[in-house]
Amino acid sequence: MATAPARRASSSRSSSEISRTTPSMGFQLGFVDDSNVFEWQVTIIGPPETLYDGGYFNAIMSFPQNYPNSPPTVRFTSEMWHPNVYPDGRVCISIHPPGDDPNGYELASERWTPVHTVESIVLSIISMLSSPNDESPANIEAAKDWREKQDEFKKKVRRAVRKSQEML
């Protein structure tokens, strides 16, 4: 369990990161509830010239008490059809807890270190939207569509983009 000074330092770091982001970076950040600095609302703007272009995808970023020593988790609350997003919305990206990947897909150097920032995490997610990794999918059905049924994959992504626009 983190000590009170460690929680304050973690809270201070994350709060300063929220003030440095702008929509021009492809995302917006805000607190879910002003009394809880450990849960953030993230809106990712679909990357231009991708299937997700035009979408506004909401997610919750939850920080552990010992952040930045452990990574936050990210879960889309908007519909998302992507090989690297679990059906429940949890994001699967390579900056997970430190150490070796139990599946052997990534090097320890590609995994979480405390130098990662909220910005680097969100930019990794934006990059993931542009370039799915179907080698180690979180959503098997989306990965199958991506590999074998591109038209079906595109149709499902377009539906998610439309739904995200309707939620504005």
Curated annotation (Swiss-Prot):
Q: Which organism is it from?
A: Triticum aestivum (Wheat)
Top EC class for this record: transferase
Q: What is this protein called?
A: Ubiquitin-conjugating enzyme E2 7
Q: Which gene encodes it?
A: UBC7
Q: In which pathway does it act?
A: Protein modification; protein ubiquitination
UniProt-recorded Gene Ontology molecular function terms? ATP binding; ubiquitin conjugating enzyme activity
Q: Which reaction does it catalyse?
A: S-ubiquitinyl-[E1 ubiquitin-activating enzyme]-L-cysteine + [E2 ubiquitin-conjugating enzyme]-L-cysteine = [E1 ubiquitin-activating enzyme]-L-cysteine + S-ubiquitinyl-[E2 ubiquitin-conjugating enzyme]-L-cysteine
Show the CDD domains listed in the entry. UBCc_UBE2G1 (cd23795)
Pfam families cross-referenced by the UniProt entry: UQ_con
Q: What is its EC number?
A: 2.3.2.23
